[in-house]
Design a protein with these regions (language model features):
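Extracytoplasmic/secretory soluble proteins
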Residues: 1-301
Length: 301
């Protein structure tokens, strides 16, 4: 309910003058957090959502125990969604126009950044950094990417007359109708660290459980390149402070939703703001703005 909800509501990423925008304190966003708090007080939100881990979440999706889901995208979601759909052909989770901006902003869903899906580091304690680098280089190559996505030609996929990759009938049948076994035996296209979307263009195969969701998202993606990788450098005092602030914000969000009334909501929010100020917040924002300026230079803006 952090950046994903903010993107859904179209919360800006920068001020009119190009400086960093404090999305967590956006009035439109906080109005929706208040709405969720009201829903919690009325018994419409279960306490389970605050404690379910990844495994519990997947199990509940597979059995349709969530009345609704709020997710930022479909990566790593297709498996449990497909299990539910296969077992219940007349029931499926679909994307809908849910929370909307109260000030007229259109959804601005995030997409892959200039630096790729994620930034990876090789630890200074790595026993063989050269081998680690070779592994990364292999996996980000076209050959490695296609291997992660489709497996081995002739065993898990074939190439049709149009040059498109197709999973073999046996593999596709397992993926669609016995996804747990598919993940155990093949686990294709689920190596999230190297889940490059460009390899989707090699195939017309789709996972039925996510087709409608992906179609719903068409036209809603907006680049956020200018705020990419703007956090303080690792091991710096500001990085440690930001880590503490982010952890505090995660617990604050839970407390905001579970607050007993508006007064308690305001008090919890004020405590978080005070926590930020006591942890060099101004210094962190200064770094945000400096790195945003550097990003603009890279983008030629």
């Amino acid at each position: 309910l952090g950046a994903d909800l903010q993107n859904f509501l179209g919360v800006p990423i920068e001020n009119a003058d190009g400086t960093w925008y404090d999305r967590n304190m956006d009035e439109d966003y906080l109005a929706w957090i208040r709405t969720l708090s009201q829903a919690y007080r009325e018994g419409l939100i279960s306490d389970d959502i605050f404690s379910d881990d990844g495994t519990a979440h997947e199990d509940k999706v597979k059995t349709g125990k969530y009345a609704c889901l709020f997710i930022g995208g479909t990566p790593q979601r297709s498996g449990p969604l497909q299990v539910w759909r296969s077992a219940n052909p007349d029931a499926e989770y679909i994307a809908i126009d849910g929370p909307q901006s109260t000030v007229g902003n259109a959804p601005t869903l995030s997409q892959a950044g200039l630096s790729g899906w994620m930034v990876n580091y090789i630890s200074k304690d790595c026993s063989d950094p050269i081998k680690a680098m070779e592994t990364f280089t292999y996996l980000i190559s076209d050959y490695g990417g296609l291997l992660c996505k489709y497996g081995v030609e002739g065993e898990t996929y074939t190439i049709n007359s149009d040059g498109l990759y197709e999973l073999t009938p046996e593999v596709k049948e397992m993926k669609d109708n016995d996804n747990d076994k598919f993940k155990h035996v093949y686990r294709l296209s689920e190596f999230i660290v190297f889940g490059n979307d460009k390899y989707d263009a090699y195939s017309a195969d789709v996972t039925e459980s996510t087709v409608q969701m992906q179609e719903w998202g068409a036209g809603k993606l907006k680049p956020q390149f200018v705020i990419e990788n703007i956090s303080p450098d690792q091991c710096s005092a500001e990085a440690r402070a930001l880590s503490a602030i982010n952890t505090n914000w995660n617990t604050t969000l839970t407390s905001l939703i579970r607050s007993a009334d508006d007064a308690a909501f305001d008090a919890v929010l004020a405590e978080h703001v005070a926590f930020r100020e006591s942890n060099n917040w101004d210094g962190i924002v200064k770094i945000y703005n400096e790195k945003m300026s550097a990003n603009r230079e890279k983008l030629g803006q």
